[in-house]
Protein backbone atom coordinates (compact mmCIF):
# COMPACT_ATOMS: atom_id res chain seq x y z
CA UNK A 1 0.00 0.00 0.00
CA UNK A 2 2.95 2.34 -0.62
CA UNK A 3 1.31 4.08 -3.57
CA UNK A 4 -1.02 7.06 -3.24
CA UNK A 5 -4.51 6.61 -4.67
CA UNK A 6 -7.08 9.12 -5.89
CA UNK A 7 -10.74 9.02 -6.92
CA UNK A 8 -13.84 11.17 -7.26
CA UNK A 9 -15.91 10.32 -4.17
CA UNK A 10 -19.20 11.97 -5.18
CA UNK A 11 -21.72 10.85 -7.77
CA UNK A 12 -20.89 11.76 -11.34
CA UNK A 13 -23.00 14.53 -12.81
CA UNK A 14 -24.09 18.13 -12.32
CA UNK A 15 -24.14 19.31 -8.70
CA UNK A 16 -23.05 22.15 -6.43
CA UNK A 17 -19.87 20.43 -5.22
CA UNK A 18 -17.70 17.47 -6.09
CA UNK A 19 -15.26 15.73 -3.73
CA UNK A 20 -11.95 14.27 -4.86
CA UNK A 21 -10.28 12.00 -2.32
CA UNK A 22 -6.54 11.32 -2.06
CA UNK A 23 -4.95 8.74 0.27
CA UNK A 24 -1.38 7.56 0.81
CA UNK A 25 2.16 8.57 1.74
CA UNK A 26 2.36 11.39 -0.81
CA UNK A 27 -1.14 12.83 -0.31
CA UNK A 28 0.09 15.90 1.59
CA UNK A 29 2.93 16.45 -0.91
CA UNK A 30 0.51 16.51 -3.85
CA UNK A 31 -1.93 18.80 -2.02
CA UNK A 32 0.80 21.34 -1.25
CA UNK A 33 1.96 21.35 -4.88
CA UNK A 34 -1.56 21.94 -6.18
CA UNK A 35 -2.35 24.71 -3.69
CA UNK A 36 1.07 26.41 -3.57
CA UNK A 37 0.90 26.12 0.22
CA UNK A 38 3.83 25.32 2.50
CA UNK A 39 1.80 23.51 5.16
CA UNK A 40 -1.71 22.34 6.03
CA UNK A 41 -3.20 22.10 9.51
CA UNK A 42 -4.76 18.66 10.06
CA UNK A 43 -8.56 18.57 10.29
CA UNK A 44 -8.94 22.23 9.28
CA UNK A 45 -10.78 23.41 6.17
CA UNK A 46 -8.54 25.53 3.96
CA UNK A 47 -10.00 27.66 1.18
CA UNK A 48 -7.49 27.79 -1.66
CA UNK A 49 -6.89 28.04 -5.36
CA UNK A 50 -5.68 24.89 -7.10
CA UNK A 51 -3.14 25.08 -9.92
CA UNK A 52 -1.86 22.64 -12.51
CA UNK A 53 1.84 22.14 -13.26
CA UNK A 54 1.73 24.97 -15.82
CA UNK A 55 0.58 27.31 -13.05
CA UNK A 56 -2.88 27.58 -14.61
CA UNK A 57 -5.79 27.74 -12.18
CA UNK A 58 -7.98 24.63 -11.98
CA UNK A 59 -10.56 25.83 -9.45
CA UNK A 60 -11.15 27.45 -6.09
CA UNK A 61 -11.74 24.71 -3.55
CA UNK A 62 -11.90 23.75 0.10
CA UNK A 63 -9.11 21.38 1.09
CA UNK A 64 -9.09 19.24 4.26
CA UNK A 65 -6.04 17.27 5.44
CA UNK A 66 -6.44 14.21 7.68
CA UNK A 67 -3.07 13.15 9.09
CA UNK A 68 -2.37 9.44 9.57
CA UNK A 69 -3.44 7.48 11.52
CA UNK A 70 -6.46 9.70 12.30
CA UNK A 71 -8.25 9.28 8.99
CA UNK A 72 -10.74 7.01 7.26
CA UNK A 73 -8.03 4.80 5.74
CA UNK A 74 -5.46 5.20 8.52
CA UNK A 75 -3.17 6.90 5.98
CA UNK A 76 -2.68 10.56 5.14
CA UNK A 77 -5.85 11.72 3.36
CA UNK A 78 -6.61 14.98 1.59
CA UNK A 79 -10.12 15.75 0.37
CA UNK A 80 -10.75 18.48 -2.20
CA UNK A 81 -14.22 20.03 -2.34
CA UNK A 82 -14.40 21.55 -5.81
CA UNK A 83 -17.30 23.00 -7.75
CA UNK A 84 -19.57 20.33 -9.15
CA UNK A 85 -20.18 19.35 -12.72
CA UNK A 86 -18.64 16.99 -15.19
CA UNK A 87 -15.31 18.72 -15.81
CA UNK A 88 -13.62 20.30 -12.77
CA UNK A 89 -13.20 17.17 -10.68
CA UNK A 90 -12.04 15.21 -13.74
CA UNK A 91 -9.35 17.83 -14.46
CA UNK A 92 -8.21 17.73 -10.83
CA UNK A 93 -8.09 13.94 -10.87
CA UNK A 94 -5.99 13.97 -14.05
CA UNK A 95 -3.59 16.44 -12.43
CA UNK A 96 -3.19 14.21 -9.37
CA UNK A 97 -2.37 11.27 -11.62
CA UNK A 98 0.21 13.36 -13.48
CA UNK A 99 1.85 14.14 -10.12
CA UNK A 100 2.17 10.43 -9.36
CA UNK A 101 -1.10 9.29 -7.83
CA UNK A 102 -2.80 6.12 -9.05
CA UNK A 103 -6.51 5.86 -9.85
CA UNK A 104 -8.14 3.98 -7.00
CA UNK A 105 -9.88 0.68 -7.60
CA UNK A 106 -13.51 0.22 -6.56
CA UNK A 107 -13.69 0.05 -2.77
CA UNK A 108 -9.94 0.52 -2.34
CA UNK A 109 -10.25 3.25 0.30
CA UNK A 110 -12.44 0.96 2.43
CA UNK A 111 -10.08 -1.96 1.84
CA UNK A 112 -7.17 0.11 3.13
CA UNK A 113 -9.25 1.12 6.15
CA UNK A 114 -9.78 -2.58 6.94
CA UNK A 115 -6.15 -3.53 6.41
CA UNK A 116 -5.05 -0.67 8.66
CA UNK A 117 -7.47 -1.69 11.43
CA UNK A 118 -9.77 1.33 11.07
CA UNK A 119 -12.85 -0.83 10.52
CA UNK A 120 -13.87 -4.46 10.15
CA UNK A 121 -14.94 -5.94 6.81
CA UNK A 122 -18.40 -6.24 8.35
CA UNK A 123 -18.66 -2.50 8.98
CA UNK A 124 -17.41 -1.81 5.46
CA UNK A 125 -20.19 -4.01 4.09
CA UNK A 126 -22.73 -2.16 6.24
CA UNK A 127 -21.52 1.19 4.89
CA UNK A 128 -21.87 -0.03 1.32
CA UNK A 129 -25.35 -1.41 2.08
CA UNK A 130 -26.34 1.94 3.58
CA UNK A 131 -25.16 3.77 0.46
CA UNK A 132 -27.19 1.41 -1.73
CA UNK A 133 -30.28 1.26 0.53
CA UNK A 134 -33.48 1.98 -1.39
CA UNK A 135 -35.94 2.77 1.40
CA UNK A 136 -36.03 4.62 4.71
CA UNK A 137 -36.71 1.37 6.55
CA UNK A 138 -33.72 -0.38 4.96
CA UNK A 139 -31.48 2.56 5.88
CA UNK A 140 -32.74 2.41 9.48
CA UNK A 141 -32.01 -1.32 9.81
CA UNK A 142 -28.55 -1.04 8.25
CA UNK A 143 -27.65 2.04 10.33
CA UNK A 144 -28.57 0.05 13.44
CA UNK A 145 -26.20 -2.73 12.35
CA UNK A 146 -23.44 -0.15 11.90
CA UNK A 147 -23.53 0.76 15.59
CA UNK A 148 -21.42 -2.30 16.26
CA UNK A 149 -23.87 -4.72 17.87
CA UNK A 150 -23.49 -7.37 15.17
CA UNK A 151 -19.73 -6.93 14.89
CA UNK A 152 -19.29 -7.18 18.66
CA UNK A 153 -21.50 -10.27 18.76
CA UNK A 154 -19.61 -12.08 16.00
CA UNK A 155 -16.28 -11.16 17.58
CA UNK A 156 -17.44 -12.47 20.97
CA UNK A 157 -18.54 -15.76 19.41
CA UNK A 158 -15.27 -16.07 17.50
CA UNK A 159 -13.27 -15.35 20.68
CA UNK A 160 -15.26 -17.97 22.62
CA UNK A 161 -14.52 -20.53 19.92
CA UNK A 162 -10.80 -19.66 19.73
CA UNK A 163 -10.35 -19.98 23.50
CA UNK A 164 -12.24 -23.28 23.53
CA UNK A 165 -10.27 -24.61 20.58
CA UNK A 166 -6.95 -23.71 22.22
CA UNK A 167 -7.93 -25.55 25.38
CA UNK A 168 -9.21 -28.63 23.54
CA UNK A 169 -6.13 -28.85 21.31
CA UNK A 170 -3.95 -28.76 24.41
CA UNK A 171 -6.02 -31.62 25.82
CA UNK A 172 -5.50 -33.59 22.60
CA UNK A 173 -1.73 -33.24 23.08
CA UNK A 174 -2.11 -34.71 26.55
CA UNK A 175 -4.52 -37.49 25.65
CA UNK A 176 -4.13 -39.30 28.95
CA UNK A 177 -5.99 -36.54 30.76
CA UNK A 178 -9.75 -36.46 30.28
CA UNK A 179 -11.58 -33.15 30.28
CA UNK A 180 -13.41 -32.53 33.58
CA UNK A 181 -17.14 -33.18 33.32
CA UNK A 182 -18.06 -29.67 34.49
CA UNK A 183 -15.83 -28.17 31.79
CA UNK A 184 -17.37 -30.42 29.16
CA UNK A 185 -20.78 -29.15 30.22
CA UNK A 186 -19.64 -25.52 29.95
CA UNK A 187 -18.22 -26.08 26.47
CA UNK A 188 -21.37 -27.89 25.38
CA UNK A 189 -23.54 -25.02 26.65
CA UNK A 190 -21.33 -22.47 24.88
CA UNK A 191 -21.66 -24.39 21.62
CA UNK A 192 -25.42 -24.66 21.93
CA UNK A 193 -25.90 -20.96 22.71
CA UNK A 194 -23.60 -19.67 19.97
CA UNK A 195 -25.02 -22.04 17.37
CA UNK A 196 -28.51 -20.82 18.27
CA UNK A 197 -27.52 -17.13 18.03
CA UNK A 198 -26.01 -17.58 14.58
CA UNK A 199 -29.02 -19.59 13.42
CA UNK A 200 -31.35 -16.80 14.54
CA UNK A 201 -29.31 -14.27 12.55
CA UNK A 202 -29.43 -16.17 9.27
CA UNK A 203 -33.03 -17.38 9.58
CA UNK A 204 -34.26 -13.88 10.50
CA UNK A 205 -32.24 -12.35 7.66
CA UNK A 206 -33.71 -14.80 5.15
CA UNK A 207 -37.31 -14.52 6.34
CA UNK A 208 -37.28 -10.70 6.50
CA UNK A 209 -34.94 -9.90 3.61
CA UNK A 210 -37.77 -7.96 1.97
CA UNK A 211 -37.43 -5.28 4.66
CA UNK A 212 -33.98 -4.44 3.28
CA UNK A 213 -34.03 -5.56 -0.36
CA UNK A 214 -37.69 -4.84 -1.02
CA UNK A 215 -40.56 -7.33 -1.16
CA UNK A 216 -41.07 -9.00 -4.52
CA UNK A 217 -44.70 -8.93 -5.66
CA UNK A 218 -45.92 -10.98 -8.62
CA UNK A 219 -49.20 -10.13 -10.35
CA UNK A 220 -50.79 -13.28 -11.76
CA UNK A 221 -53.99 -14.11 -13.60
CA UNK A 222 -55.33 -15.25 -16.94
CA UNK A 223 -55.02 -12.87 -19.92
CA UNK A 224 -56.98 -9.62 -19.99
CA UNK A 225 -58.12 -9.50 -16.36
CA UNK A 226 -56.43 -6.12 -15.78
CA UNK A 227 -52.99 -7.10 -14.48
CA UNK A 228 -51.22 -4.36 -16.43
CA UNK A 229 -53.81 -1.79 -15.35
CA UNK A 230 -53.15 -2.81 -11.74
CA UNK A 231 -49.39 -2.45 -12.26
CA UNK A 232 -49.86 1.04 -13.70
CA UNK A 233 -52.15 2.01 -10.81
CA UNK A 234 -49.64 0.85 -8.19
CA UNK A 235 -46.80 2.71 -9.92
CA UNK A 236 -49.01 5.80 -10.48
CA UNK A 237 -47.87 6.03 -14.09
CA UNK A 238 -48.41 4.05 -17.30
CA UNK A 239 -45.61 1.49 -17.44
CA UNK A 240 -47.38 -1.40 -19.17
CA UNK A 241 -49.45 -1.37 -22.35
CA UNK A 242 -53.15 -1.80 -21.58
CA UNK A 243 -55.21 -3.45 -24.32
CA UNK A 244 -58.41 -5.43 -24.77
CA UNK A 245 -56.39 -7.92 -26.79
CA UNK A 246 -55.56 -10.98 -24.67
CA UNK A 247 -51.85 -11.82 -24.53
CA UNK A 248 -50.58 -8.25 -24.94
CA UNK A 249 -48.07 -8.76 -22.11
CA UNK A 250 -45.74 -11.57 -23.20
CA UNK A 251 -42.73 -10.84 -21.04
CA UNK A 252 -42.38 -10.05 -17.35
CA UNK A 253 -42.19 -6.36 -16.44
CA UNK A 254 -40.45 -5.45 -13.17
CA UNK A 255 -40.55 -2.04 -11.50
CA UNK A 256 -40.07 -0.69 -7.97
CA UNK A 257 -42.23 1.65 -5.92
CA UNK A 258 -42.55 2.70 -2.29
CA UNK A 259 -45.52 2.12 -0.04
CA UNK A 260 -45.00 3.98 3.21
CA UNK A 261 -41.46 3.15 4.34
CA UNK A 262 -41.34 -0.12 2.39
CA UNK A 263 -39.79 -0.77 -0.99
CA UNK A 264 -41.81 -3.07 -3.25
CA UNK A 265 -40.49 -4.72 -6.41
CA UNK A 266 -43.51 -5.56 -8.50
CA UNK A 267 -43.62 -7.93 -11.46
CA UNK A 268 -46.40 -7.93 -14.06
CA UNK A 269 -46.47 -11.38 -15.63
CA UNK A 270 -47.83 -12.70 -18.90
CA UNK A 271 -51.38 -14.04 -18.66
CA UNK A 272 -51.39 -17.73 -17.83
CA UNK A 273 -53.35 -19.84 -20.31
CA UNK A 274 -52.88 -22.66 -22.81
CA UNK A 275 -51.36 -21.26 -25.98
CA UNK A 276 -49.72 -22.58 -29.16
CA UNK A 277 -47.84 -19.31 -29.64
CA UNK A 278 -44.16 -20.07 -28.90
CA UNK A 279 -43.40 -16.58 -27.61
CA UNK A 280 -46.47 -16.54 -25.37
CA UNK A 281 -45.49 -19.97 -24.01
CA UNK A 282 -42.12 -18.54 -22.97
CA UNK A 283 -43.93 -15.67 -21.26
CA UNK A 284 -46.14 -18.10 -19.34
CA UNK A 285 -43.06 -20.05 -18.22
CA UNK A 286 -41.48 -16.81 -16.98
CA UNK A 287 -44.70 -16.01 -15.13
CA UNK A 288 -44.54 -19.29 -13.23
CA UNK A 289 -40.87 -18.64 -12.40
CA UNK A 290 -41.81 -15.20 -11.06
CA UNK A 291 -44.32 -16.83 -8.70
CA UNK A 292 -41.54 -18.98 -7.25
CA UNK A 293 -39.35 -15.93 -6.61
CA UNK A 294 -42.10 -13.69 -5.22
CA UNK A 295 -42.70 -12.88 -1.55
CA UNK A 296 -46.26 -11.71 -2.21
CA UNK A 297 -48.72 -12.70 -4.94
CA UNK A 298 -51.56 -10.58 -6.31
CA UNK A 299 -54.00 -13.04 -7.91
CA UNK A 300 -56.27 -11.08 -10.25
CA UNK A 301 -59.69 -12.16 -11.56
CA UNK A 302 -62.27 -10.35 -13.69
CA UNK A 303 -65.59 -9.59 -11.97
CA UNK A 304 -67.30 -8.94 -15.31
CA UNK A 305 -66.56 -12.41 -16.74
CA UNK A 306 -67.93 -15.79 -15.72
CA UNK A 307 -65.40 -18.02 -14.00
CA UNK A 308 -63.89 -20.49 -16.49
CA UNK A 309 -61.22 -23.20 -16.78
CA UNK A 310 -58.43 -20.64 -17.07
CA UNK A 311 -59.48 -19.14 -13.73
CA UNK A 312 -59.54 -22.63 -12.23
CA UNK A 313 -55.97 -23.16 -13.40
CA UNK A 314 -54.90 -20.05 -11.51
CA UNK A 315 -56.54 -21.39 -8.34
CA UNK A 316 -54.84 -24.77 -8.87
CA UNK A 317 -51.47 -23.13 -9.53
CA UNK A 318 -51.63 -21.29 -6.20
CA UNK A 319 -53.23 -24.07 -4.17
CA UNK A 320 -50.06 -25.34 -2.50
CA UNK A 321 -48.00 -22.18 -2.20
CA UNK A 322 -46.97 -20.84 1.19
CA UNK A 323 -46.65 -17.30 -0.18
CA UNK A 324 -48.91 -14.49 0.99
CA UNK A 325 -51.72 -14.12 -1.58
CA UNK A 326 -54.05 -11.17 -2.05
CA UNK A 327 -57.11 -12.30 -4.02
CA UNK A 328 -58.30 -9.43 -6.22
CA UNK A 329 -61.60 -9.14 -8.08
CA UNK A 330 -60.89 -6.45 -10.65
CA UNK A 331 -63.43 -4.50 -12.73
CA UNK A 332 -65.86 -4.59 -9.80
CA UNK A 333 -67.38 -1.35 -11.06
CA UNK A 334 -68.96 -3.41 -13.86
CA UNK A 335 -71.76 -5.97 -13.56
CA UNK A 336 -70.44 -8.74 -11.30
CA UNK A 337 -71.00 -12.20 -12.83
CA UNK A 338 -67.95 -13.93 -11.31
CA UNK A 339 -68.97 -16.72 -8.91
CA UNK A 340 -66.70 -17.08 -5.87
CA UNK A 341 -66.79 -20.90 -5.85
CA UNK A 342 -63.46 -21.07 -3.98
CA UNK A 343 -64.73 -18.92 -1.09
CA UNK A 344 -61.74 -16.59 -1.30
CA UNK A 345 -61.65 -13.32 0.60
CA UNK A 346 -61.56 -11.11 -2.48
CA UNK A 347 -60.57 -7.45 -2.50
CA UNK A 348 -63.05 -5.83 -4.87
CA UNK A 349 -61.71 -2.90 -6.87
CA UNK A 350 -61.35 -1.23 -10.24
CA UNK A 351 -57.69 -0.90 -11.24
CA UNK A 352 -58.55 1.96 -13.57
CA UNK A 353 -60.44 3.93 -10.91
CA UNK A 354 -59.38 3.26 -7.31
CA UNK A 355 -57.05 0.75 -5.61
CA UNK A 356 -57.00 2.40 -2.17
CA UNK A 357 -58.33 -0.73 -0.45
CA UNK A 358 -55.55 -2.89 -1.90
CA UNK A 359 -52.89 -0.40 -0.83
CA UNK A 360 -54.30 -0.38 2.70
CA UNK A 361 -54.31 -4.19 2.87
CA UNK A 362 -50.73 -4.32 1.55
CA UNK A 363 -49.61 -1.67 4.04
CA UNK A 364 -51.18 -3.54 6.98
CA UNK A 365 -49.45 -6.76 5.93
CA UNK A 366 -46.05 -5.08 5.53
CA UNK A 367 -46.41 -3.34 8.90
CA UNK A 368 -46.85 -6.75 10.53
CA UNK A 369 -43.17 -7.47 9.87
CA UNK A 370 -41.16 -6.59 12.97
CA UNK A 371 -37.98 -4.76 11.95
CA UNK A 372 -36.27 -5.45 15.27
CA UNK A 373 -33.50 -7.99 15.69
CA UNK A 374 -30.27 -8.43 13.79
CA UNK A 375 -30.79 -8.63 10.03
CA UNK A 376 -28.11 -8.64 7.36
CA UNK A 377 -28.41 -8.28 3.61
CA UNK A 378 -25.03 -9.70 2.57
CA UNK A 379 -25.59 -13.19 1.17
CA UNK A 380 -21.95 -13.97 1.96
CA UNK A 381 -22.45 -13.10 5.63
CA UNK A 382 -25.75 -14.99 5.83
CA UNK A 383 -24.02 -18.09 4.45
CA UNK A 384 -21.11 -17.63 6.88
CA UNK A 385 -23.54 -17.53 9.84
CA UNK A 386 -25.31 -20.64 8.53
CA UNK A 387 -22.09 -22.61 7.97
CA UNK A 388 -20.73 -21.56 11.38
CA UNK A 389 -23.95 -22.39 13.21
CA UNK A 390 -24.13 -25.85 11.67
CA UNK A 391 -20.42 -26.52 12.33
CA UNK A 392 -20.75 -25.53 16.00
CA UNK A 393 -23.86 -27.70 16.34
CA UNK A 394 -21.97 -30.68 14.89
CA UNK A 395 -19.05 -29.93 17.21
CA UNK A 396 -21.36 -30.15 20.23
CA UNK A 397 -22.41 -33.65 19.19
CA UNK A 398 -18.79 -34.71 18.64
CA UNK A 399 -17.85 -33.40 22.07
CA UNK A 400 -20.48 -35.62 23.65
CA UNK A 401 -18.97 -38.55 21.72
CA UNK A 402 -15.47 -37.58 22.99
CA UNK A 403 -14.24 -37.12 19.39
CA UNK A 404 -11.99 -34.19 20.23
CA UNK A 405 -10.04 -34.15 16.93
CA UNK A 406 -13.24 -33.88 14.89
CA UNK A 407 -14.62 -31.37 17.41
CA UNK A 408 -11.54 -29.21 16.81
CA UNK A 409 -11.99 -29.51 13.02
CA UNK A 410 -15.58 -28.25 13.17
CA UNK A 411 -14.67 -25.40 15.51
CA UNK A 412 -11.87 -24.37 13.16
CA UNK A 413 -14.36 -24.26 10.29
CA UNK A 414 -16.68 -21.95 12.24
CA UNK A 415 -13.80 -19.71 13.38
CA UNK A 416 -12.51 -19.25 9.84
CA UNK A 417 -15.97 -18.35 8.52
CA UNK A 418 -16.57 -15.73 11.24
CA UNK A 419 -13.02 -14.36 11.02
CA UNK A 420 -13.71 -13.18 7.46
CA UNK A 421 -15.92 -10.44 8.92
CA UNK A 422 -14.04 -9.55 12.11
CA UNK A 423 -11.11 -7.31 12.91
CA UNK A 424 -8.27 -9.81 12.54
CA UNK A 425 -9.01 -10.88 8.96
CA UNK A 426 -6.25 -10.05 6.46
CA UNK A 427 -6.62 -12.35 3.43
CA UNK A 428 -6.17 -10.07 0.42
CA UNK A 429 -7.87 -12.26 -2.19
CA UNK A 430 -11.13 -12.37 -0.23
CA UNK A 431 -10.98 -8.63 0.49
CA UNK A 432 -10.42 -7.94 -3.23
CA UNK A 433 -13.59 -9.87 -4.05
CA UNK A 434 -15.55 -8.19 -1.25
CA UNK A 435 -14.58 -4.59 -2.05
CA UNK A 436 -14.67 -5.02 -5.83
CA UNK A 437 -18.41 -4.22 -5.78
CA UNK A 438 -17.97 -0.97 -3.83
CA UNK A 439 -18.19 2.55 -5.22
CA UNK A 440 -15.13 4.32 -6.56
CA UNK A 441 -13.83 6.74 -3.94
CA UNK A 442 -15.18 4.61 -1.09
Curated annotation (Swiss-Prot):
Gene3D superfamilies linked to this entry: P-loop containing nucleotide triphosphate hydrolases (3.40.50.300), Probable tRNA modification gtpase trme, domain 1 (3.30.1360.120), tRNA modification GTPase MnmE domain 2 (1.20.120.430)
GO biological process: tRNA methylation; tRNA wobble uridine modification
Keyword presence, Protein transport: no
GO cellular component: cytosol
NCBIfam families found in the cross-reference section: mnmE_trmE_thdF, small_GTP
Family: Belongs to the TRAFAC class TrmE-Era-EngA-EngB-Septin-like GTPase superfamily. TrmE GTPase family.
Protein name as it appears in the record: tRNA modification GTPase MnmE
Organism of origin: Campylobacter jejuni subsp. jejuni serotype O:6 (strain 81116 / NCTC 11828)
Taxonomic classification: Bacteria, Pseudomonadati, Campylobacterota, Epsilonproteobacteria, Campylobacterales
Amino acid sequence: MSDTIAAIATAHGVGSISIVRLSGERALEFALKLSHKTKLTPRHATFTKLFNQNNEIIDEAIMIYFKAPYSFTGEDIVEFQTHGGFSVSEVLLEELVSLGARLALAGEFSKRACLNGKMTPLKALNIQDLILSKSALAAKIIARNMQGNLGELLEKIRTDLVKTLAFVETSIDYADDDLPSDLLEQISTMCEENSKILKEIYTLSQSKKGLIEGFKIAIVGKPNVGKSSLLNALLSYERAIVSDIAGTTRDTIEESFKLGTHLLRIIDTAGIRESKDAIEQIGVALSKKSLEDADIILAVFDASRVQDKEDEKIFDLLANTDKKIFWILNKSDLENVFKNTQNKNFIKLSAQKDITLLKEELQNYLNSFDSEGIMVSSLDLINACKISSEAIFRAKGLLEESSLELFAFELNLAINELARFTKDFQRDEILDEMFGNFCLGK
